[in-house]
Amino acid sequence: MPDAEVRKILNIPEDRIVIELSQVTDSVEGTPVAYDIKYILYEQAYPSVESEIRFAVFPELTLPKMAAFSYYTDVQIRAVGASEAVAKVLECRIGEPLLLVERIYIQQNGKRIGYALHYSRQPYGALKGTSGYRL
């Protein structure tokens, strides 16, 4: 079951099942440089979720089941100090500056369907973006 912070962000009750996916990205030298934590609501209507988890990239796991314009993303980008848990995964010191990209996936009706955290170490974090759909 998700912790209180994740339940609050996703606006779900305590007994709601959430799937947590974690991924660490290493540099060529083998140093951990990025850490992703993703939460998606478990839907029994999609029995293939269990078999897809090993192979899917986060939005590809749930979002193809929806029309492209049926959801949007709230994004917050900020600098944070590494918590004890994140420092352990990224093999850095507690408090080391990291770039955090936090995303909440929201359906047009306001229902929150996913939450993602991406931590990047220096000098690997960079910002670049495109807005809207490019045809």
Predicted feature locations:
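C-terminal all-alpha effector/ligand-binding and dimerization domain
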Residues: 1-135
